[in-house]
Swiss-Prot record:
Listed NCBIfam families: PRK05293.1
Gene3D superfamilies: Spore Coat Polysaccharide Biosynthesis Protein SpsA, Chain A
Described function: Catalyzes the synthesis of ADP-glucose, a sugar donor used in elongation reactions on alpha-glucans.
Organism encoding this protein: Bacillus caldolyticus
Any one of the GO BP annotations: glycogen biosynthetic process
Reaction(s) this enzyme catalyzes, per UniProt: alpha-D-glucose 1-phosphate + ATP + H(+) = ADP-alpha-D-glucose + diphosphate
Keyword Nucleotide-binding among record annotations: yes
Cited SUPFAM superfamilies: Nucleotide-diphospho-sugar transferases (SSF53448)
InterPro entries reported for this sequence: ADP-Glc_PPase (IPR011831), ADP_Glu_pyroP_CS (IPR005836), NTP_transferase_dom (IPR005835), Nucleotide-diphossugar_trans (IPR029044)
UniProt pathway: Glycan biosynthesis; glycogen biosynthesis
Protein name: Glucose-1-phosphate adenylyltransferase
Superkingdom per UniProt: Bacteria
Pfam families: NTP_transferase
Molecular function, one GO term: glucose-1-phosphate adenylyltransferase activity
Length: 250
């Protein structure tokens, strides 16, 4: 069943900086405002953006998250063709093989993506609080004829070293990207939301997987490699409210 764009939602985070809040549950399952959990924001965004096929990649303490997501009916994602699918790490040979990084998590689930033969893959994080129309970002990605588009937000300078930081030219093309730099040159931060042309992403996940020196992370490995090889990466400026639930304070 061909899909124009599917989403892969990274919900495996242990959230060790959140201390006792996440002792027994994955960070995206942390309760927010009583009856919601943090992952609700991203799943609702998918539904409201017309993205009806979402793979949720879980690994740390996944049971609560699995039962919470269920078949996705809370977000109108209980579809016969697509819908929401929980994708825990599986091992072909022995024991459980943990996802080794954000890029490795997607790499291990390329078969899931292939069955939809998408033109584009939207990569999301399940531990952010924000409202966003991903369809607008996809339209922007297509209009810019980009290989990859990264959603960005201006953060306070004193917080910039917590994020992937990029410099862009006047056309919003990314010319430089540094993951958590000690001395940031810009305060334009990656929101951990990416759109890739699937054929390109597939190729670069395979290259990354074969690299013994890679930590298999989008921010540390895949994005810098795409830049080095002069792929067209553009930044999509987001103006709304966004919080990365990385620390108890936020």
């Amino acid at each position: 069943m061909k899909k124009k764009c599917i989403a892969m939602l990274l919900a495996g985070g242990q959230g060790s900086r959140l201390r006792s809040l996440t002792k027994n549950i994955a960070k995206p399952a942390v309760p927010f405002g009583g009856k919601y959990r943090i992952i609700d924001f991203t799943l609702s965004n998918c539904t409201n953006s017309g993205i009806d096929t979402v793979g949720v990649l879980t690994q740390y303490q996944p049971l609560l998250l699995h039962s919470y997501i269920g078949i996705g009916s809370a977000w109108d994602l209980d579809r016969r063709n697509g819908g929401v699918t929980v994708l825990p790490p599986y091992s072909a040979s022995s024991g459980v093989k943990w996802y080794e990084g954000t890029a490795n998590a997607i790499y291990q689930n390329m078969n899931y993506i292939e069955q939809y033969d998408p033109d584009y893959v939207l990569v999301l994080s399940g531990d952010h609080i924000y409202k966003m129309d991903y369809q607008q970002m996809l339209d922007y990605h297509i209009a810019k004829q980009a290989d990859a588009t990264i959603s960005v937000i201006e953060v306070p300078w004193e917080e910039a070293s917590r994020f992937g930081i990029m410099n862009t030219n006047e056309n919003m093309e990314i010319v430089e990207f540094a993951e958590k730099p000690a001395n940031p040159k810009s305060n334009l931060a990656s929101m951990g939301i990416y759109i890739f042309n699937w054929p390109l992403l597939r190729e670069y996940l395979q290259i990354d997987n074969a690299d013994p020196h890679s930590s298999h992370d989008f921010g540390k490995d895949v994005i810098p490699r795409l830049l080095r090889e002069n792929k067209r990466l553009v930044a999509y400026p987001f103006k709304g409210y966004w919080k990365d639930v990385g620390t108890v304070k936020s």
